[in-house]
Amino acid sequence: MSDNVPTIAAVATAPGRGGVGVIRISGKNLLPMAQALCGKTPKPRVATYADFTDEDGQAIDSGLLLFFAAPASFTGEDVIELQGHGGPVVMDMLLNRCLELGARLAEPGEFTKRAFLNDKLDLAQAEGVADLIDASSRSAARLALRSLKGDFSRRIHGLVEDLITLRMLVEATLDFPEEDIDFLEAADARGKLDGLRRAVDDVLANAQQGAILREGLNVVLVGAPNVGKSSLLNALAGDEVAIVTDIAGTTRDAVRERILIDGVPVHIVDTAGLRETDDVVERIGIERSRKAVSEADVALVLVDPREGLNEKTRAILDALPLELKRIEIHSKSDLHAHAAGGFGTGAETVIALSAKTGDGLDALKRTLLREAGWQGESEGLFLARTRHVNALKAAQEELSLAALCGNHQIELFAEHLRLAQVACGEITGEFTADDLLGVIFSRFCIGK
């Protein structure tokens, strides 16, 4: 990084009141700032008890000061942490004092971004920091920690090293174009390529599982009015999150709820119907429902077996994208017998369910996990993002194209290897555009 990088400061603990609050400062040559803050010169990695004072020497708070000298710190720069009492007024006064002494307020994710730019961690590890903070389940937290500790990165670095080795082998043959030799066969380049393809497939399979655990499944509930969509949402959520009455059309806006099934987040939207209406308020809810449908991975199509596919249900089915996966739910199974087979909703799975008694809920949850592609947490998994999966798919495609090259298409073979390496490098940040870095780190919390 440049020598002109400014000193930054921010509250590193969550907003609100707490027993302890932490101010984090990062920059170059921070000992004079520490001296001005508490009248002491701290030793590296030693907790120093001190009064934190304002410009007039009046105590703002008392607590612990920790100093981490560059480069042995989280950001790779000098880092100071002030651990004081966790009230918002005290934290605000301490932060303002740091700003008076020359620091500026840190942007979201700026501490982690500096750690990345100073080679303290790579991009996949940096994203692991945010994912650990945002983890919605124990499984997600465990897998995010693996990414933070470098499990995912080591897999990617291994792929890159193998790609570089194969590229060196292949590109060395380009120095001898006049030789009538099948270099790809002679150097066993194809055998090595097959091994690389298997390795990429393995990492991709793990990344897809990690992405499922991080990003979950988007589900919409659709069906005719008063068929039991809100009751099903409440049953899945285990709470009264939607109003349930005997009046058709009670739900006038899309109701959203997130649940966990075996640690996998499932984002459920109870739609406000998919029909035309003159009611302005209801029309807004219907537009939101249509948007939810367009973003969904699975639609739960609720059908009353006593009525089958009535005109309203058919109209709703016509509004669903053809490629959207569907699960047909025969609702209110406690009130009537389950109809054999489905009603032609386009669903491969039919489940009889009672939101009142809970019968069929476990079967539905298992089916949702299957539709998500979740295979269960296993050794070697790590938390991943959609961009990681897409990058690995790009590498997979380039290696597949390399395998199609003729025996003497060495230059084209080498180019596909290079592009596969670039795709893998995007994951760890070796080849990453600045605008992508800005997007990634802007989603962090301030102080991290």
From Swiss-Prot:
The record's GO CC annotations read: cytosol
Pfam families in the cross-refs: MMR_HSR1, MnmE_helical, TrmE_N
Locate the residues binding GTP: 226-231, 245-251, 270-273
InterPro entries, per the entry = G_TrmE (IPR031168), GTP-bd (IPR006073), GTP-bd_TrmE_N (IPR018948), GTPase_MnmE (IPR004520), MnmE_dom2 (IPR027368), MnmE_helical (IPR025867), P-loop_NTPase (IPR027417), Small_GTP-bd (IPR005225)
HAMAP family membership = GTPase_MnmE
Entry's family note: Belongs to the TRAFAC class TrmE-Era-EngA-EngB-Septin-like GTPase superfamily. TrmE GTPase family.
The UniProt annotation places K(+) binding at N226, T245, I247, T250
Q: Which GO MF terms does the UniProt record name?
A: GTP binding; GTPase activity; metal ion binding
What cofactor does this protein call for?
K(+)
Keyword vocabulary terms for this entry:
Cytoplasm, GTP-binding, Hydrolase, Magnesium, Metal-binding, Nucleotide-binding, Potassium, tRNA processing
Q: Under which EC number(s) is this enzyme classified?
A: 3.6.-.-
Q: Where does (6S)-5-formyl-5,6,7,8-tetrahydrofolate bind?
A: R24, E81, K120, K448
Q: Where in the cell is it found?
A: Cytoplasm
How is the cofactor bound, in the record's words?
Answer: Binds 1 potassium ion per subunit.
Q: What class of enzyme is it?
A: hydrolase
Q: Which GO terms describe its biological process?
A: tRNA methylation; tRNA wobble uridine modification
Origin organism is Neisseria meningitidis serogroup A / serotype 4A (strain DSM 15465 / Z2491)
Self-association and partners: Homodimer. Heterotetramer of two MnmE and two MnmG subunits.
Which segments constitute the TrmE-type G domain? 216-373
**Entry function:** Exhibits a very high intrinsic GTPase hydrolysis rate. Involved in the addition of a carboxymethylaminomethyl (cmnm) group at the wobble position (U34) of certain tRNAs, forming tRNA-cmnm(5)s(2)U34.
SUPFAM superfamilies the record matches: P-loop containing nucleoside triphosphate hydrolases, TrmE connector domain
Q: What is this protein called?
A: tRNA modification GTPase MnmE
Question: Which amino acid positions bind Mg(2+), per UniProt?
Answer: S230, T251
